[in-house]
């Protein structure tokens, strides 16, 4: 796809608090190029850099989506969990929003078996299979299903490793980042002033704690993916 204008508005970013970083004493020096100033002990993110990298990220995901490739969105902390799920559902992406289980990507063969178990249990529940089990066995199966749905429900139908992973809060999702790096899966990360931008293929400098900031970034990426999918469907 040709690069597009993604309606990235500095005033909207200000209103969403995208510019508000962490306490200066907690910063990662690698974020220096993305910091505009320090105010009352808080680092202020340079929104022109945020706009540039947001646009680059949107172009990237739109291109990937236009080729019919798959995404996984990751955001498990409480501020991001429901926003991650809603953005992923909007863009028809897989997502992880409860807890990143070690080996989700690097131990994919085992994860595939867990996902098949989830689908089997779900099918058994829908067809009344639990009702035909002894009470204790039914309770165990229902417990297994609830646990699997909680942690794996967002990737239930992920048939292979994702082509791109988007991540909210790089520090919180350090295991996910490491697995992506190990497998050479490109990442787009929302990075606050305490993060290492070098770990992401496309870092988007932004407040990773405020819900409005997370929503703003997630919505832009989801919209760009949707645009890319439209192009793929036309072809």
UniProtKB/Swiss-Prot annotation:
Which Cys-Cys disulfides exist here? Answer: none
Which Gene3D superfamilies does the UniProt entry name for this protein? Answer: Glucose-6-phosphate isomerase like protein, domain 1, Helix hairpin bin
- Give the UniProt keywords, A-Z: Chloroplast, Plastid, Ribonucleoprotein, Ribosomal protein
Any one GO BP annotation for this protein: translation
Q: Which Pfam families match?
A: Ribosomal_S2
Q: Where mainly found? A: plastid
Molecular function, one GO term: structural constituent of ribosome
GO CC term (a single one): chloroplast
Per UniProt, subcellular location reads as: Plastid, Chloroplast
Family under the similarity heading: Belongs to the universal ribosomal protein uS2 family.
Q: Which protein, by its recorded name, is this?
A: Small ribosomal subunit protein uS2c
Native source organism of the sequence: Huperzia lucidula
